From Swiss-Prot:
It comes from Bacillus atrophaeus. One of its GO terms (biological process) is amino acid metabolic process. The keyword Oxidoreductase does not apply. Keywords: Decarboxylase, Lyase, Pyridoxal phosphate. Its EC number is 4.1.1.28. One of its GO terms (molecular function) is pyridoxal phosphate binding. The broad substrate specificity of AADC-BA could be exploited to produce various aromatic biogenic amines. The modification N6-(pyridoxal phosphate)lysine is found at residue 292. This is Aromatic-L-amino-acid decarboxylase.
Protein backbone atom coordinates (compact mmCIF):
# COMPACT_ATOMS: atom_id res chain seq x y z
CA UNK A 1 0.00 0.00 0.00
CA UNK A 2 1.12 3.53 -0.75
CA UNK A 3 2.72 5.46 2.08
CA UNK A 4 0.81 8.56 0.98
CA UNK A 5 -2.53 6.77 1.43
CA UNK A 6 -3.37 6.62 -2.27
CA UNK A 7 -4.50 3.96 -4.69
CA UNK A 8 -3.76 4.09 -8.39
CA UNK A 9 -6.46 5.41 -10.69
CA UNK A 10 -7.24 1.88 -11.87
CA UNK A 11 -7.37 0.54 -8.31
CA UNK A 12 -9.76 3.32 -7.34
CA UNK A 13 -12.02 2.54 -10.29
CA UNK A 14 -12.09 -1.17 -9.56
CA UNK A 15 -12.80 -0.60 -5.87
CA UNK A 16 -15.53 1.89 -6.72
CA UNK A 17 -17.13 -0.45 -9.25
CA UNK A 18 -17.06 -3.24 -6.68
CA UNK A 19 -18.72 -1.04 -4.05
CA UNK A 20 -21.41 0.10 -6.51
CA UNK A 21 -22.09 -3.50 -7.51
CA UNK A 22 -22.53 -4.50 -3.87
CA UNK A 23 -25.01 -1.67 -3.27
CA UNK A 24 -27.03 -2.36 -6.42
CA UNK A 25 -27.12 -6.08 -5.66
CA UNK A 26 -28.34 -5.26 -2.14
CA UNK A 27 -31.10 -2.99 -3.42
CA UNK A 28 -32.24 -5.30 -6.21
CA UNK A 29 -32.37 -8.43 -4.06
CA UNK A 30 -33.49 -6.92 -0.77
CA UNK A 31 -36.92 -8.57 -0.80
CA UNK A 32 -35.34 -12.02 -0.95
CA UNK A 33 -33.45 -11.40 2.30
CA UNK A 34 -34.79 -11.76 5.83
CA UNK A 35 -35.64 -8.37 7.29
CA UNK A 36 -33.25 -8.90 10.18
CA UNK A 37 -30.06 -10.93 9.84
CA UNK A 38 -28.36 -10.19 13.14
CA UNK A 39 -26.61 -13.08 14.85
CA UNK A 40 -25.18 -13.81 18.28
CA UNK A 41 -22.98 -11.03 19.64
CA UNK A 42 -20.25 -13.49 20.64
CA UNK A 43 -19.91 -14.64 17.04
CA UNK A 44 -19.68 -11.06 15.79
CA UNK A 45 -17.18 -10.18 18.48
CA UNK A 46 -14.97 -13.09 17.49
CA UNK A 47 -15.12 -12.13 13.82
CA UNK A 48 -14.65 -8.39 14.16
CA UNK A 49 -12.51 -7.80 17.24
CA UNK A 50 -8.80 -7.48 16.45
CA UNK A 51 -5.76 -5.33 17.04
CA UNK A 52 -5.11 -2.39 14.75
CA UNK A 53 -3.32 -3.77 11.65
CA UNK A 54 0.30 -2.80 11.14
CA UNK A 55 0.14 -3.50 7.41
CA UNK A 56 -2.61 -3.13 4.86
CA UNK A 57 -4.75 -5.74 3.11
CA UNK A 58 -6.29 -6.16 -0.32
CA UNK A 59 -9.22 -3.69 -0.41
CA UNK A 60 -11.26 -5.95 -2.71
CA UNK A 61 -11.06 -8.76 -0.17
CA UNK A 62 -11.97 -6.36 2.61
CA UNK A 63 -15.16 -5.34 0.80
CA UNK A 64 -16.08 -9.01 0.45
CA UNK A 65 -15.40 -9.44 4.17
CA UNK A 66 -17.63 -6.47 5.03
CA UNK A 67 -20.42 -7.74 2.84
CA UNK A 68 -20.37 -11.15 4.52
CA UNK A 69 -19.80 -10.11 8.11
CA UNK A 70 -21.22 -6.61 8.52
CA UNK A 71 -23.74 -5.64 5.84
CA UNK A 72 -25.38 -9.06 5.99
CA UNK A 73 -25.49 -8.97 9.80
CA UNK A 74 -27.85 -6.04 10.25
CA UNK A 75 -31.52 -5.26 10.32
CA UNK A 76 -32.39 -3.90 6.89
CA UNK A 77 -34.36 -0.77 7.76
CA UNK A 78 -34.75 -0.16 4.01
CA UNK A 79 -36.45 -3.55 3.53
CA UNK A 80 -40.02 -3.20 2.21
CA UNK A 81 -41.16 -5.51 5.03
CA UNK A 82 -39.46 -3.48 7.77
CA UNK A 83 -42.48 -1.87 9.43
CA UNK A 84 -41.00 -1.26 12.89
CA UNK A 85 -39.98 2.02 14.52
CA UNK A 86 -39.53 4.42 11.57
CA UNK A 87 -38.27 2.71 8.40
CA UNK A 88 -35.35 4.16 6.47
CA UNK A 89 -36.32 3.64 2.82
CA UNK A 90 -33.48 5.47 1.15
CA UNK A 91 -32.98 5.91 -2.59
CA UNK A 92 -30.02 5.28 -4.85
CA UNK A 93 -29.74 8.90 -5.98
CA UNK A 94 -29.22 9.94 -2.36
CA UNK A 95 -26.56 7.25 -2.01
CA UNK A 96 -24.70 8.61 -5.05
CA UNK A 97 -24.96 12.12 -3.61
CA UNK A 98 -23.35 10.98 -0.36
CA UNK A 99 -20.58 9.29 -2.37
CA UNK A 100 -19.93 12.52 -4.28
CA UNK A 101 -20.01 14.65 -1.13
CA UNK A 102 -17.41 12.40 0.49
CA UNK A 103 -15.35 11.99 -2.67
CA UNK A 104 -14.98 15.73 -3.17
CA UNK A 105 -14.59 16.14 0.61
CA UNK A 106 -16.94 19.12 0.59
CA UNK A 107 -16.77 21.41 3.62
CA UNK A 108 -20.07 23.37 3.70
CA UNK A 109 -19.26 25.40 6.79
CA UNK A 110 -18.08 28.73 5.36
CA UNK A 111 -18.71 30.45 2.04
CA UNK A 112 -14.98 30.76 1.47
CA UNK A 113 -14.61 26.98 1.73
CA UNK A 114 -17.74 25.69 0.00
CA UNK A 115 -19.66 28.40 -1.83
CA UNK A 116 -21.33 26.03 -4.30
CA UNK A 117 -22.33 23.62 -1.56
CA UNK A 118 -23.64 26.42 0.64
CA UNK A 119 -25.78 27.73 -2.22
CA UNK A 120 -27.19 24.23 -2.77
CA UNK A 121 -28.06 24.10 0.93
CA UNK A 122 -29.70 27.53 0.77
CA UNK A 123 -31.73 26.48 -2.26
CA UNK A 124 -32.84 23.21 -0.67
CA UNK A 125 -33.75 24.94 2.59
CA UNK A 126 -35.83 27.38 0.53
CA UNK A 127 -37.66 24.45 -1.07
CA UNK A 128 -38.52 23.02 2.35
CA UNK A 129 -39.58 26.45 3.65
CA UNK A 130 -41.93 26.84 0.71
CA UNK A 131 -43.25 23.31 1.11
CA UNK A 132 -44.11 23.94 4.76
CA UNK A 133 -45.45 27.46 4.33
CA UNK A 134 -42.64 29.28 6.12
CA UNK A 135 -41.91 32.86 5.01
CA UNK A 136 -39.08 33.70 2.63
CA UNK A 137 -37.31 35.42 5.52
CA UNK A 138 -37.10 32.19 7.54
CA UNK A 139 -33.78 30.40 7.86
CA UNK A 140 -32.63 26.84 8.43
CA UNK A 141 -29.87 24.30 8.14
CA UNK A 142 -29.32 20.59 7.78
CA UNK A 143 -28.14 18.58 10.78
CA UNK A 144 -27.71 14.90 11.62
CA UNK A 145 -31.31 14.16 12.57
CA UNK A 146 -34.30 15.05 14.71
CA UNK A 147 -32.39 14.93 17.98
CA UNK A 148 -29.86 17.53 16.83
CA UNK A 149 -32.60 19.55 15.13
CA UNK A 150 -34.67 19.69 18.32
CA UNK A 151 -31.59 20.64 20.34
CA UNK A 152 -30.77 23.40 17.85
CA UNK A 153 -34.31 24.80 17.84
CA UNK A 154 -34.64 24.76 21.64
CA UNK A 155 -31.25 26.46 22.01
CA UNK A 156 -32.55 29.24 19.76
CA UNK A 157 -35.78 29.43 21.78
CA UNK A 158 -33.80 29.75 25.02
CA UNK A 159 -31.78 32.61 23.55
CA UNK A 160 -34.74 34.38 21.94
CA UNK A 161 -37.17 34.22 24.86
CA UNK A 162 -34.92 34.00 27.93
CA UNK A 163 -31.62 35.49 26.81
CA UNK A 164 -30.18 32.25 28.23
CA UNK A 165 -31.46 33.02 31.77
CA UNK A 166 -33.38 29.81 32.45
CA UNK A 167 -34.19 30.38 36.13
CA UNK A 168 -37.92 29.78 36.75
CA UNK A 169 -38.48 29.07 33.05
CA UNK A 170 -40.96 26.35 32.10
CA UNK A 171 -41.37 24.36 28.88
CA UNK A 172 -44.56 22.47 28.01
CA UNK A 173 -45.27 19.41 25.89
CA UNK A 174 -47.48 16.33 25.92
CA UNK A 175 -46.86 12.84 27.24
CA UNK A 176 -46.52 11.69 23.61
CA UNK A 177 -43.54 13.92 22.78
CA UNK A 178 -40.35 12.23 21.57
CA UNK A 179 -37.68 11.63 24.22
CA UNK A 180 -35.13 13.62 22.20
CA UNK A 181 -36.87 16.71 23.57
CA UNK A 182 -36.18 15.59 27.15
CA UNK A 183 -32.57 14.93 26.21
CA UNK A 184 -32.20 18.34 24.56
CA UNK A 185 -33.63 20.13 27.60
CA UNK A 186 -31.27 18.20 29.85
CA UNK A 187 -28.32 19.28 27.72
CA UNK A 188 -29.55 22.88 27.88
CA UNK A 189 -29.55 22.84 31.67
CA UNK A 190 -33.26 22.62 32.44
CA UNK A 191 -34.22 20.75 35.61
CA UNK A 192 -36.97 18.21 36.02
CA UNK A 193 -39.29 20.71 37.71
CA UNK A 194 -39.01 23.06 34.72
CA UNK A 195 -40.49 20.47 32.38
CA UNK A 196 -44.28 20.26 32.36
CA UNK A 197 -45.98 17.33 30.64
CA UNK A 198 -49.56 18.06 29.66
CA UNK A 199 -52.19 15.35 29.42
CA UNK A 200 -53.49 14.24 26.04
CA UNK A 201 -57.05 13.80 24.85
CA UNK A 202 -58.66 10.60 23.57
CA UNK A 203 -56.86 11.11 20.25
CA UNK A 204 -53.48 11.43 22.01
CA UNK A 205 -53.20 15.12 21.15
CA UNK A 206 -52.15 17.67 23.73
CA UNK A 207 -55.07 19.15 25.67
CA UNK A 208 -55.00 22.84 24.79
CA UNK A 209 -57.40 23.69 27.62
CA UNK A 210 -55.19 21.92 30.16
CA UNK A 211 -52.14 23.67 28.73
CA UNK A 212 -53.81 27.07 28.93
CA UNK A 213 -54.78 26.43 32.55
CA UNK A 214 -51.27 25.28 33.46
CA UNK A 215 -49.60 28.34 31.92
CA UNK A 216 -51.94 30.62 33.85
CA UNK A 217 -51.21 28.80 37.12
CA UNK A 218 -47.47 28.93 36.53
CA UNK A 219 -47.52 32.67 35.88
CA UNK A 220 -49.32 33.27 39.20
CA UNK A 221 -46.49 31.35 40.90
CA UNK A 222 -43.85 33.62 39.39
CA UNK A 223 -42.67 31.11 36.81
CA UNK A 224 -41.73 32.02 33.22
CA UNK A 225 -43.53 30.00 30.55
CA UNK A 226 -41.30 30.33 27.50
CA UNK A 227 -41.84 27.40 25.12
CA UNK A 228 -44.54 24.98 23.98
CA UNK A 229 -43.51 21.96 21.93
CA UNK A 230 -46.16 20.68 19.54
CA UNK A 231 -46.19 17.27 17.90
CA UNK A 232 -46.55 17.27 14.13
CA UNK A 233 -46.85 13.49 13.86
CA UNK A 234 -45.92 11.53 16.98
CA UNK A 235 -43.61 8.55 16.72
CA UNK A 236 -46.05 6.46 18.76
CA UNK A 237 -49.13 6.77 16.58
CA UNK A 238 -48.80 9.66 14.11
CA UNK A 239 -50.98 12.03 16.14
CA UNK A 240 -50.84 15.73 15.31
CA UNK A 241 -51.54 18.35 17.97
CA UNK A 242 -53.97 21.19 17.24
CA UNK A 243 -51.35 23.44 15.67
CA UNK A 244 -53.55 26.46 14.98
CA UNK A 245 -54.93 26.46 18.53
CA UNK A 246 -51.43 26.18 19.94
CA UNK A 247 -50.20 28.99 17.70
CA UNK A 248 -53.03 31.23 18.90
CA UNK A 249 -52.25 30.42 22.53
CA UNK A 250 -48.51 30.96 22.15
CA UNK A 251 -49.10 34.25 20.37
CA UNK A 252 -51.38 35.45 23.18
CA UNK A 253 -48.92 34.32 25.86
CA UNK A 254 -45.74 35.48 24.07
CA UNK A 255 -44.41 31.93 24.21
CA UNK A 256 -42.18 30.23 21.63
CA UNK A 257 -43.93 27.49 19.62
CA UNK A 258 -41.68 24.69 18.44
CA UNK A 259 -43.19 21.98 16.22
CA UNK A 260 -41.48 18.60 16.18
CA UNK A 261 -42.22 17.32 12.70
CA UNK A 262 -39.21 15.02 12.56
CA UNK A 263 -41.49 12.21 11.46
CA UNK A 264 -44.65 13.79 10.12
CA UNK A 265 -43.82 17.16 8.56
CA UNK A 266 -43.07 15.90 5.01
CA UNK A 267 -46.61 14.50 4.86
CA UNK A 268 -47.71 18.05 4.09
CA UNK A 269 -47.01 17.14 0.45
CA UNK A 270 -50.06 14.85 0.51
CA UNK A 271 -53.67 15.99 0.63
CA UNK A 272 -54.46 14.03 3.80
CA UNK A 273 -51.23 15.05 5.49
CA UNK A 274 -51.76 18.70 4.63
CA UNK A 275 -55.21 18.62 6.23
CA UNK A 276 -53.77 17.16 9.44
CA UNK A 277 -50.86 19.59 9.55
CA UNK A 278 -52.83 22.81 9.21
CA UNK A 279 -51.10 25.58 11.13
CA UNK A 280 -47.60 24.10 10.99
CA UNK A 281 -46.45 27.21 9.12
CA UNK A 282 -47.16 29.30 12.24
CA UNK A 283 -44.50 27.63 14.40
CA UNK A 284 -41.49 29.68 15.49
CA UNK A 285 -39.30 26.67 14.78
CA UNK A 286 -39.80 23.31 13.11
CA UNK A 287 -37.82 20.11 12.76
CA UNK A 288 -38.09 17.44 10.08
CA UNK A 289 -36.03 14.41 9.08
CA UNK A 290 -35.46 13.86 5.36
CA UNK A 291 -33.99 10.46 6.24
CA UNK A 292 -37.49 9.40 7.23
CA UNK A 293 -40.34 10.49 4.95
CA UNK A 294 -38.21 12.11 2.26
CA UNK A 295 -36.49 8.77 1.69
CA UNK A 296 -32.86 9.83 2.16
CA UNK A 297 -29.94 7.70 3.40
CA UNK A 298 -28.84 8.36 6.96
CA UNK A 299 -28.15 10.88 8.20
CA UNK A 300 -29.98 14.12 7.48
CA UNK A 301 -32.27 16.20 9.65
CA UNK A 302 -33.39 19.79 9.23
CA UNK A 303 -34.36 22.72 11.43
CA UNK A 304 -36.29 25.77 10.24
CA UNK A 305 -36.51 29.03 12.22
CA UNK A 306 -39.24 31.54 11.36
CA UNK A 307 -37.31 34.74 12.15
CA UNK A 308 -34.14 35.38 10.20
CA UNK A 309 -30.82 35.85 11.98
CA UNK A 310 -31.89 33.92 15.10
CA UNK A 311 -29.58 31.02 14.26
CA UNK A 312 -26.49 33.18 13.81
CA UNK A 313 -27.39 35.34 16.82
CA UNK A 314 -27.55 32.20 18.94
CA UNK A 315 -24.51 30.32 17.67
CA UNK A 316 -22.14 32.77 15.97
CA UNK A 317 -18.61 33.03 17.37
CA UNK A 318 -15.63 34.56 15.60
CA UNK A 319 -12.27 33.62 17.13
CA UNK A 320 -9.18 35.10 15.56
CA UNK A 321 -8.18 31.94 13.69
CA UNK A 322 -11.32 31.86 11.49
CA UNK A 323 -11.77 35.59 10.82
CA UNK A 324 -10.64 35.05 7.23
CA UNK A 325 -13.92 33.20 6.65
CA UNK A 326 -16.10 36.10 7.82
CA UNK A 327 -18.45 37.49 5.18
CA UNK A 328 -20.83 40.44 5.09
CA UNK A 329 -21.79 40.04 1.45
CA UNK A 330 -25.54 39.79 0.88
CA UNK A 331 -26.52 36.27 -0.17
CA UNK A 332 -23.44 34.64 1.32
CA UNK A 333 -23.73 32.54 4.46
CA UNK A 334 -21.49 30.60 6.81
CA UNK A 335 -23.52 27.62 8.01
CA UNK A 336 -20.86 26.90 10.62
CA UNK A 337 -22.15 30.00 12.44
CA UNK A 338 -25.75 28.79 12.40
CA UNK A 339 -25.64 25.68 14.55
CA UNK A 340 -23.71 23.46 16.92
CA UNK A 341 -21.54 21.76 14.29
CA UNK A 342 -18.55 23.50 12.77
CA UNK A 343 -17.31 20.47 10.86
CA UNK A 344 -20.33 19.19 8.97
CA UNK A 345 -21.22 16.99 6.01
CA UNK A 346 -22.71 18.19 2.74
CA UNK A 347 -26.07 16.69 3.72
CA UNK A 348 -28.12 19.01 1.53
CA UNK A 349 -26.78 17.45 -1.66
CA UNK A 350 -28.76 14.20 -1.41
CA UNK A 351 -32.02 16.04 -0.75
CA UNK A 352 -31.35 18.47 -3.62
CA UNK A 353 -30.31 15.76 -6.09
CA UNK A 354 -33.25 13.49 -5.19
CA UNK A 355 -35.76 16.29 -5.75
CA UNK A 356 -34.06 17.20 -9.03
CA UNK A 357 -33.98 13.63 -10.35
CA UNK A 358 -37.46 12.47 -9.29
CA UNK A 359 -39.42 15.70 -8.91
CA UNK A 360 -41.68 16.57 -6.00
CA UNK A 361 -44.63 14.77 -7.63
CA UNK A 362 -42.89 11.42 -7.11
CA UNK A 363 -42.36 12.22 -3.43
CA UNK A 364 -46.01 13.18 -3.09
CA UNK A 365 -47.09 9.86 -4.60
CA UNK A 366 -44.72 7.92 -2.34
CA UNK A 367 -46.09 9.64 0.77
CA UNK A 368 -49.68 9.03 -0.35
CA UNK A 369 -48.80 5.36 -0.82
CA UNK A 370 -47.48 5.05 2.74
CA UNK A 371 -50.60 6.66 4.17
CA UNK A 372 -52.80 4.34 2.10
CA UNK A 373 -50.96 1.21 3.26
CA UNK A 374 -51.64 1.98 6.93
CA UNK A 375 -55.30 2.56 6.09
CA UNK A 376 -55.33 -0.80 4.31
CA UNK A 377 -54.02 -2.50 7.46
CA UNK A 378 -56.66 -0.79 9.59
CA UNK A 379 -59.39 -1.99 7.22
CA UNK A 380 -58.02 -5.54 7.32
CA UNK A 381 -57.97 -5.59 11.12
CA UNK A 382 -61.47 -4.16 11.30
CA UNK A 383 -62.78 -7.29 9.59
CA UNK A 384 -60.62 -9.76 11.55
CA UNK A 385 -61.85 -11.58 14.63
CA UNK A 386 -59.91 -11.07 17.89
CA UNK A 387 -58.08 -7.93 16.75
CA UNK A 388 -58.44 -4.43 18.18
CA UNK A 389 -57.36 -1.24 16.41
CA UNK A 390 -56.05 0.92 19.26
CA UNK A 391 -55.31 4.04 17.22
CA UNK A 392 -56.54 4.43 13.65
CA UNK A 393 -54.22 4.87 10.70
CA UNK A 394 -52.82 8.38 10.64
CA UNK A 395 -49.73 9.58 8.81
CA UNK A 396 -48.70 6.05 7.89
CA UNK A 397 -48.88 4.59 11.42
CA UNK A 398 -51.51 2.24 12.87
CA UNK A 399 -51.46 0.52 16.27
CA UNK A 400 -53.38 -2.61 17.17
CA UNK A 401 -53.31 -5.72 19.34
CA UNK A 402 -54.40 -9.32 19.32
CA UNK A 403 -57.00 -10.26 21.93
CA UNK A 404 -57.95 -13.96 21.87
CA UNK A 405 -61.63 -14.15 22.76
CA UNK A 406 -61.04 -16.65 25.55
CA UNK A 407 -58.51 -14.42 27.32
CA UNK A 408 -59.39 -11.55 29.61
CA UNK A 409 -56.21 -10.95 31.60
CA UNK A 410 -54.54 -7.70 30.56
CA UNK A 411 -51.11 -9.01 31.54
CA UNK A 412 -51.55 -12.14 29.44
CA UNK A 413 -52.76 -10.15 26.43
CA UNK A 414 -49.74 -7.87 26.77
CA UNK A 415 -47.38 -10.84 26.90
CA UNK A 416 -48.97 -12.47 23.86
CA UNK A 417 -48.53 -9.32 21.78
CA UNK A 418 -44.91 -8.93 22.89
CA UNK A 419 -44.18 -12.54 22.00
CA UNK A 420 -45.98 -12.19 18.68
CA UNK A 421 -43.77 -9.28 17.62
CA UNK A 422 -40.62 -11.19 18.61
CA UNK A 423 -41.78 -14.22 16.66
CA UNK A 424 -42.52 -12.13 13.55
CA UNK A 425 -38.92 -10.88 13.60
CA UNK A 426 -37.60 -14.39 14.25
CA UNK A 427 -39.49 -15.81 11.26
CA UNK A 428 -37.95 -13.08 9.09
CA UNK A 429 -40.94 -12.29 6.88
CA UNK A 430 -41.44 -8.84 8.44
CA UNK A 431 -40.50 -6.71 11.42
CA UNK A 432 -42.86 -4.70 13.61
CA UNK A 433 -42.40 -3.14 17.04
CA UNK A 434 -44.41 -2.65 20.21
CA UNK A 435 -45.23 0.45 22.18
CA UNK A 436 -47.52 1.31 25.07
CA UNK A 437 -50.69 3.36 24.61
CA UNK A 438 -53.53 3.87 27.03
CA UNK A 439 -51.77 1.48 29.43
CA UNK A 440 -51.81 -1.29 26.82
CA UNK A 441 -48.97 -3.02 25.03
CA UNK A 442 -49.82 -2.58 21.36
CA UNK A 443 -48.28 -3.57 18.05
CA UNK A 444 -47.15 -0.62 15.99
CA UNK A 445 -46.85 -0.67 12.20
CA UNK A 446 -45.23 2.13 10.19
CA UNK A 447 -45.74 1.83 6.44
CA UNK A 448 -43.74 4.62 4.82
CA UNK A 449 -41.58 2.52 2.47
CA UNK A 450 -42.76 3.33 -1.09
CA UNK A 451 -41.52 -0.05 -2.30
CA UNK A 452 -43.93 -2.01 -0.07
CA UNK A 453 -46.78 -3.14 -2.30
CA UNK A 454 -50.43 -3.51 -1.30
CA UNK A 455 -50.21 -7.22 -2.09
CA UNK A 456 -47.17 -7.66 0.15
CA UNK A 457 -48.87 -5.82 3.00
CA UNK A 458 -51.92 -8.07 2.74
CA UNK A 459 -49.69 -11.17 2.75
CA UNK A 460 -47.82 -9.89 5.79
CA UNK A 461 -51.05 -9.29 7.70
CA UNK A 462 -52.36 -12.76 6.80
CA UNK A 463 -49.14 -14.29 8.13
CA UNK A 464 -49.35 -12.21 11.31
CA UNK A 465 -52.96 -13.28 11.82
CA UNK A 466 -52.06 -16.97 11.51
CA UNK A 467 -48.97 -16.58 13.68
CA UNK A 468 -50.99 -14.87 16.43
CA UNK A 469 -53.25 -17.90 16.71
CA UNK A 470 -50.19 -20.14 16.87
CA UNK A 471 -48.52 -18.05 19.57
CA UNK A 472 -51.62 -17.80 21.76
CA UNK A 473 -52.03 -21.58 21.99
CA UNK A 474 -49.18 -21.78 24.52
CA UNK A 475 -51.00 -19.46 26.95
CA UNK A 476 -53.59 -20.74 29.43
CA UNK A 477 -57.06 -19.29 29.42
CA UNK A 478 -57.19 -16.59 32.08
CA UNK A 479 -60.37 -15.02 33.40
CA UNK A 480 -60.27 -11.55 34.87
Amino acid sequence: MSENLQLSAEEMRQLGYQAVDLIIDHMNHLKSKPVSETIDSDILRNKLTESIPENGSDPKELLHFLNRNVFNQITHVDHPHFLAFVPGPNNYVGVVADFLASGFNVFPTAWIAGAGAEQIELTTINWLKSMLGFPDSAEGLFVSGGSMANLTALTVARQAKLNNDIENAVVYFSDQTHFSVDRALKVLGFKHHQICRIETDEHLRISVSALKKQIKEDRTKGKKPFCVIANAGTTNCGAVDSLNELADLCNDEDVWLHADGSYGAPAILSEKGSAMLQGIHRADSLTLDPHKWLFQPYDVGCVLIRNSQYLSKTFRMMPEYIKDSETNVEGEINFGECGIELSRRFRALKVWLSFKVFGVAAFRQAIDHGIMLAEQVEAFLGKAKDWEVVTPAQLGIVTFRYIPSELASTDTINEINKKLVKEITHRGFAMLSTTELKEKVVIRLCSINPRTTTEEMLQIMMKIKALAEEVSISYPCVAE
